[in-house]
Amino acid sequence: MPGPAAGSRARVYAEVNSLRSREYWDYEAHVPSWGNQDDYQLVRKLGRGKYSEVFEAINITNNERVVVKILKPVKKKKIKREVKILENLRGGTNIIKLIDTVKDPVSKTPALVFEYINNTDFKQLYQILTDFDIRFYMYELLKALDYCHSKGIMHRDVKPHNVMIDHQQKKLRLIDWGLAEFYHPAQEYNVRVASRYFKGPELLVDYQMYDYSLDMWSLGCMLASMIFRKEPFFHGQDNYDQLVRIAKVLGTDELYGYLKKYHIDLDPHFNDILGQHSRKRWENFIHSENRHLVSPEALDLLDKLLRYDHQQRLTAKEAMEHPYFYPVVKEQSQPCAENTVLSSGLTAAR
């Protein structure tokens, strides 16, 4: 019989929720106040997800453009969790702002109202980003992650679809907190979170005692896809194949080292499909089309994010201190940074 997996705890912000009152993290006890959806006139559908339909809308009381996320029938507990987390994070750096919680007067269907972001579809946007743009937006995303982690919250679904970018205004917002959860040390979490291409190895090997570092893996996948112009970077056909794709880059010996450290037993199905792979050098992914986006600092940062061992990954704060971001930090520390950032030139930041 396989024994129990070894424990693990976050390297940072581990006790944040224990130091807060129960009211802060006990979302099941939370009673959201629901206003009337009649204040909002739906304009057009922006998209649909597994759990919701999203619309651009107008607040008829003040003519403000907003986004209305109408929630599909789902457990009350999940809705309470999302609302509580959004309320706790309100005003946080680069976190989408929850404006209102409303219900349709007839159907009683709950909906969340958010600030509107004039988003550019990432498939188009990622094709035109400069080296400096990538550094800039990754830094802005790290601000959002460090903020939510410092508040005791893991996002658990970091991916391009959930990162809204208004490229004109150089504005980034981390959205969709529907899978987010409060971090408590030694708690075992559901591994059926995140989207396949952005799932950390811990999820793929069924290791439940994960933490904020899961979000750092997903951010690493985004960084890799941006600098190498390969979207997604790890392109698995299913959850099993996803780990195989990762192992082909990070190596199988390294994977077994990770499993051994945490006493993780691998699903026997992997015996047939994993094979043996040596660790690849990040330089192998450079070609003529992406060379202008890759630098030694970019590869060094990537290497420190895409680690099997979740405890070895950089934290959001550590990542923000990496030399890759020096040009961004330098620009943001200048007076009138608002104006200079529009140049998006690496030269301007040196």
UniProtKB/Swiss-Prot annotation:
Belongs to the protein kinase superfamily. Ser/Thr protein kinase family. CK2 subfamily. Constitutively active protein kinase whose activity is not directly affected by phosphorylation. Seems to be regulated by level of expression and localization. The modification Phosphoserine is found at S18, S21, S288. The modification Phosphotyrosine is found at Y13. Keywords: Acetylation, Apoptosis, ATP-binding, Cell cycle, Cytoplasm, Kinase, Nucleotide-binding, Nucleus, Phosphoprotein, Serine/threonine-protein kinase, Transcription, Transcription regulation, Transferase, Wnt signaling pathway. Its EC number is 2.7.11.1. The active site is at D157 (proton acceptor). Residues 40-325 form the Protein kinase domain. InterPro entries: CK2_alpha, Kinase-like_dom_sf, Prot_kinase_dom, Protein_kinase_ATP_BS, Ser/Thr_kinase_AS. Its main location: nucleus. Can use both ATP and GTP as phosphoryl donors. Phosphorylation by casein kinase 2 has been estimated to represent up to one quarter of the eukaryotic phosphoproteome. This is Casein kinase II subunit alpha'. Disruption phenotype: Infertile male mice with oligospermia and globozoospermia. Heterotetramer composed of two catalytic subunits (alpha chain and/or alpha' chain) and two regulatory subunits (beta chains). The tetramer can exist as a combination of 2 alpha/2 beta, 2 alpha'/2 beta or 1 alpha/1 alpha'/2 beta subunits. Also part of a CK2-SPT16-SSRP1 complex composed of SSRP1, SUPT16H, CSNK2A1, CSNK2A2 and CSNK2B, which forms following UV irradiation. Interacts with RNPS1. Interacts with CSNK2A2IP (via C-terminus). Interacts with SIRT6; preventing CSNK2A2 localization to the nucleus. Interacts with HIRIP3. Catalytic subunit of a constitutively active serine/threonine-protein kinase complex that phosphorylates a large number of substrates containing acidic residues C-terminal to the phosphorylated serine or threonine. Regulates numerous cellular processes, such as cell cycle progression, apoptosis and transcription, as well as viral infection. May act as a regulatory node which integrates and coordinates numerous signals leading to an appropriate cellular response. The modification N6-acetyllysine is found at K97. Pfam families: Pkinase (PF00069). Highly expressed in brain, testis and mature epididymal spermatozoa. Weakly expressed in kidney, liver, lung, spleen and thymus (at protein level). The gene is Csnk2a2.
